[in-house]
């Protein structure tokens, strides 16, 4: 039995050695292939973010997510311009409760409604 154990132990060691050499060989061909590709395409490994165009767009930042954001920003710009054009700074709202006498008279419409007329057809 001692001979069998001795025979098994060297076999296990050689199996472990084979795995180690396979790992080393697995790394070496990858490194060799990587070096070959770097030699073939030298400009690819230098920029770790993409093309110049992509980097410029990313640095610029995104202004609007979609057309809704664009339209809301456009409306805000118009609202900022209106008060500066000519607003009454003395106008205070909320202090006075309007009454029917304070409200201006309603303009009569030029087209008469069929419902408002007293004619029944």
Curated annotation (Swiss-Prot):
Post-translational modifications reported in the UniProt record: Phosphorylation at Ser-67 by GWL during mitosis is essential for interaction with PPP2R2D (PR55-delta) and subsequent inactivation of PP2A. Phosphorylated by PKA.
Entry keyword Cell division: yes
Any GO BP: regulation of insulin secretion
Tissue: Present in striatum (at protein level).
Region (Disordered) location: 1-53, 79-121
A cellular component annotation (GO) from this entry: cytoplasm
One family name in Pfam for this protein: Endosulfine
The organism's place on the tree of life at top rank: Eukaryota
Recorded family membership: Belongs to the endosulfine family.
Name assigned to this protein: Alpha-endosulfine
Organism of provenance: Mus musculus (Mouse)
Lineage, uppermost ranks: Eukaryota, Metazoa, Chordata, Craniata, Vertebrata
């Amino acid at each position: 039995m001692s001979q069998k154990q001795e025979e098994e132990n060297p076999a296990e060691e050689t199996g472990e050695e084979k795995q180690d050499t396979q790992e080393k060989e697995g790394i070496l061909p990858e490194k060799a292939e990587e070096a070959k590709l770097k030699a073939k395409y030298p400009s690819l490994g230098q920029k770790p973010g993409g093309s110049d165009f992509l980097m410029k767009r990313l640095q610029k930042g995104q202004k609007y997510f979609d057309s809704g954001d664009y339209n809301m920003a456009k409306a805000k710009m118009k609202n900022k311009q209106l008060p500066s054009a000519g607003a009454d700074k003395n106008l205070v709202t909320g202090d006075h409760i309007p009454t029917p006498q304070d409200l201006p008279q309603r303009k009569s419409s030029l087209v008469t409604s069929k419902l408002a007329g007293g004619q029944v057809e």
